[in-house]
């Protein structure tokens, strides 16, 4: 998309404003700040259940959550102070509780064609522990849904992407052309928006593009020339599990400049933060490589992903629990309790 509408990703406050205009019920309670004034009282107003978001891009690491990264109100005030010191603006939002999912849509400025929904895992370590990352891995089901989502939930998210694309045009006069990525959360109070991105999700793109049946170039051309309505966009009925291997110490103090050994001819392998030096693959410090497993059964797809990862070596680690029965069952159980 063009810069005017890509602001949906680069400015958290602009994104919330757009959502307010077209589907305000999808926004959490929130307030914008550029100074420390009023921060403590608003956090108290939210009952100490809050999220602080830097109003800009920080590689998926500018969000701090109470009870996870921020242990108390003083921790929240201290992080707000950090942002103010570098001249930044930030949002404080109510903390939403539920299960996150990603829905990406192809958009030609008028028509949206939706991709299968995917669930990302931001935390660095097994069991959803450790610091936030750009995303350690993702999974999608063969029915293009997720086990804790209803058809109604998915339709709601699709409608939200459509309304947001339309509102962006109305607000800026610039049609949104490209991939629109909605980050959603299913809560006890329904589907809410966490954030928007003006691009493919990483790792989510590897899940959906791995099962895309239609010609990708044709889809891109149809977005640009406004003919997406007549373009076939279809996906194989397969489950996918994508897992990243990352340097030890990632994301805070990643090791760098070590050799990575892998089968570069493996079609399920996607190299990322590496460089070729003297015919050797060298890790650069961010997420190193991803492997995608595909099958009609998500747990078999997970085993395929693990098999691919077993062929990669270096000073690396990955999350073994993504796409496993234990983790997926815990997500279903948690959502059932929230929806009681």
Predicted regions and their residues:
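Structural element of the ATP-grasp superfamily
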Residues: 19-20
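Short, conserved charged micro-motifs
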Residues: 38-39, 71-75, 149, 153, ...
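Internal nucleotide-binding/catalytic subdomain
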Residues: 47, 63-203
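Active-site "cap" helix and flanking loop/linker of ATP-utilizing ligase/carboxylase catalytic domains
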Residues: 155-181, 197-266, 276-277
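Peripheral (often C-terminal) accessory segments that flank ATP-dependent C-N-forming ligase machineries
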Residues: 222-340
């Amino acid at each position: 998309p063009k810069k005017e509408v890509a602001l949906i990703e680069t400015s958290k406050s602009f994104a919330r404003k757009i959502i307010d205009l077209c589907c305000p019920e999808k926004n959490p309670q929130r307030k914008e700040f550029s100074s420390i004034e009023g921060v403590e009282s608003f956090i108290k107003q939210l009952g100490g259940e809050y999220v602080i978001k830097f109003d800009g891009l920080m590689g998926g690491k500018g969000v701090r959550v109470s009870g996870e990264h921020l242990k108390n109100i003083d921790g929240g005030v201290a992080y707000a102070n950090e942002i103010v010191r570098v001249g930044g603006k930030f949002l404080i939002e109510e903390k939403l509780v539920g299960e996150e999912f990603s829905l990406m849509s192809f958009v030609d400025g008028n028509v949206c064609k939706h991709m299968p929904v995917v669930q990302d895992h931001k935390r660095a370590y097994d069991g959803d522990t450790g610091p936030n990352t750009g995303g350690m891995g993702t999974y999608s089901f063969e029915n293009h849904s997720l086990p804790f989502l209803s058809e109604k939930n998915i339709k709601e998210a699709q409608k939200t992407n459509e309304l947001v694309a339309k509102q962006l045009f109305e607000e800026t006069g610039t049609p949104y052309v490209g991939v629109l990525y909605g980050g959603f959360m299913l809560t006890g109070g329904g589907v809410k928006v966490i954030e928007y991105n003006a691009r493919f999700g990483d790792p989510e793109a590897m899940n959906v593009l791995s099962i895309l049946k239609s010609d990708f170039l044709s889809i891109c051309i149809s977005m640009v020339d406004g003919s997406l309505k007549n373009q076939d966009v279809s996906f194989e009925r397969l489950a996918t599990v994508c897992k990243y291997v990352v340097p030890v110490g990632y994301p805070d103090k990643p090791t760098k400049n070590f050799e990575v050994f892998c089968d570069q001819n493996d079609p399920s392998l996607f190299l990322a933060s590496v460089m070729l030096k003297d015919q050797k693959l060298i890790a650069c410090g961010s997420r190193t490589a991803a492997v995608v497993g595909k099958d009609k059964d998500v747990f078999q797809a997970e085993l395929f992903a693990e098999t691919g990862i077993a062929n990669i070596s270096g000073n690396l680690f990955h999350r073994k629990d993504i796409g496993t029965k234990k983790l997926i069952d815990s997500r279903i159980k948690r959502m059932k309790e929230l929806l009681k």
